[in-house]
Design a protein with these regions (language model features):
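Catalytic helix-loop patch of NAD(P)-dependent Rossmann-fold dehydrogenases
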Residues: 2, 6, 14-56, 60-61
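Residue-level signal for the nucleotide or nucleotide-sugar donor/cofactor binding architecture
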Residues: 26, 33, 91-94, 128, ...
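NAD(P)-dependent short-chain dehydrogenase/reductase
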Residues: 44-91, 96-98, 104-105
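Glycine-rich Rossmann NAD(P)(H)-binding loop
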Residues: 85-90, 120-127, 175
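Amphipathic alpha-helical segments that line or abut small-molecule/effector binding pockets
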Residues: 97-108, 184, 188
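Mid/C-terminal beta-alpha module of Rossmann-like enzyme folds, strongest
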Residues: 102-103, 109-159
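A hydrophobic C-terminal alpha-helical subdomain
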Residues: 153-175, 180, 190
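Amphipathic terminal alpha-helices
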Residues: 183-197
């Protein structure tokens, strides 16, 4: 910011409280946990810097690399007959590769026109529950494990998580031509990549 350089900041759906969505970029924030509060503080610092910037909120990221839900489900599905997965939290899983591509498009747009500063949302489509996402993973990987729906209350975590992580991404399409990726297509590619590894 001190050098007048534009920058891109990646944030999260956790800045919201999980009330029914999809959430728009300008909707009021209300994080439920420390992670969400620190990400919101990061957003506020970016805006206060005075530099040209884009804040990109995303959620439920998956990839053939690193630790993520898809890789966890593949591991569990290969080892168990049944997997209990939360069915009352919904979101739109985006592939990491699509996020990277969106970031490049946004960074170039901001470089050309610093007036493009703002906050945007990017996630996959269509919306899905964790349990249905797990079923899609089992189907795509041809794993026989059954997915049993459970409520989030039966899967305690150290931090509260939003029940509805859907993000409205229409602003990205209108302003930058960035379309939500279909996670089903990308899931097939990620699983094929992992099987070939």
């Amino acid at each position: 910011a001190d050098r007048g350089l534009p920058f891109l900041h990646v944030s999260t759906d956790y800045v919201f409280d999980g009330s029914p969505g999809p959430r728009h970029p300008g909707d009021p924030t209300a994080p439920l946990n420390a992670y969400g509060r620190t990400k919101l503080a990061g957003e506020q610092a970016v805006r206060a810097s005075g530099a040209a910037h884009v804040i990109l909120r995303t959620s439920w990221v998956f990839s053939a690399h690193g630790a993520n839900f898809v890789k966890t489900m593949l591991r569990l599905g290969a080892a168990r007959d049944e997997i209990a997965v939360v069915a009352d939290q919904i979101g739109g899983p985006p592939p990491a590769a699509a996020i990277a591509k969106a970031c490049l498009t946004l960074a170039e747009a901001l470089r050309r026109d610093p007036g493009k500063s703002g906050t945007h949302h990017f996630c996959g489509a269509p919306a899905v529950s964790w349990a249905d996402f797990a079923r899609a993973i089992m189907d795509q990987a041809a794993l026989p494990a059954r997915v049993r729906d459970i409520p989030a209350a039966d899967y305690p975590t150290p931090a509260r998580r939003p029940a509805d992580s859907r993000l409205d991404c229409s602003q990205l399409a209108t302003e930058f031509g960035i379309i939500q990726p279909d996670w089903r297509t990308h899931l097939a590619a990620v699983i094929a990549q992992l099987k070939g590894a």
